[in-house]
Amino acid sequence: MARRELGPAALAVAQAVERMVRGVDRFVVGCSGGPDSLALALASKWASRRCESGVRVVIVDHQLQQGSDEVAERTRDLLVRRGMDACVRRVDVDADDPDGPEAAARTARRAALLDVAGDEPVLLGHTRDDQAEQVLLSLARGSGATSLAGIRPRSGQFWHPLLEVRRAQTVQACREWEVEPWQDPHNGDPRFLRSRVRTELMPVMEEVLGPEVAASLARSATLLAGEDEVVARVARMWADEHGVKANELPGLRGVEVGLARRVVKEWLPQARMVHVDAVLGLLDGPGGAGVDVPGGRVEMRQGTLYLARRL
């Protein structure tokens, strides 16, 4: 499809994808059938031709809603008719996940995407609006800089080319491509906090603070991400200099709390801030004390933190 044949919204989405996949041989697109990911998938066809890249689309069916199989099949058929390589992957979501159904679905979805992708990058359709919502949720939870930095453009194999694109643009892009995206009923369900942020909080913030509030929140996330990377690099340098091992963290007493917190976070990447602070609390407690963390237990002995991993 020539550049001039795309409508303005579709072109904005397609160019965002092109900028990210330039120089990539092959990539995978995760798609739910909703407007963001459907626009991403169609834009990827345009971008892959311009960049001479191969692209596959994976539609993940979480099997959590009645009719989800029909949505997945319909989305695949639409993309195949548009000349794309598309497949459906069905996943089982752990209903007992302690982090809740949304986190469990995310874990299952990403595992399915990586299974198809191998070592290829996986593109996801998060927009600037998603970024703004993520920052607000992190603020409400009292999160640190890593979470407040929001969604990174590249996070391992998962790439997010649409972080400078508004949700309204992906919706309009679907109109310009003359496709009807699936509307996830969960997106408007007030039982879900993210849905309430989207449908209740953001409209009020835009009314009070102006229509560019999402852009401002996203810009703050970008600034924090750059600073967070510097802090992480300093923490890793400190760990190298002090002989930190996978199960052993010495010499943390007397270190400034900001650096100490990040050293522990790098040492325990699955830990949340509540776990990190609990581990730091061991530094001022009696020897032999310990705290449970994801995957194991940390104990303090003779000024050194030890991690006993849970099998």
UniProtKB/Swiss-Prot annotation:
Keywords: ATP-binding, Cytoplasm, Ligase, Nucleotide-binding, tRNA processing. It comes from the Bacteria. It catalyses: cytidine(34) in tRNA(Ile2) + L-lysine + ATP = lysidine(34) in tRNA(Ile2) + AMP + diphosphate + H(+). GO terms for cellular component: cytoplasm. Its main location: cytoplasm. One of its GO terms (biological process) is tRNA modification. Pfam families: ATP_bind_3. This is tRNA(Ile)-lysidine synthase. It comes from Cutibacterium acnes (strain DSM 16379 / KPA171202).
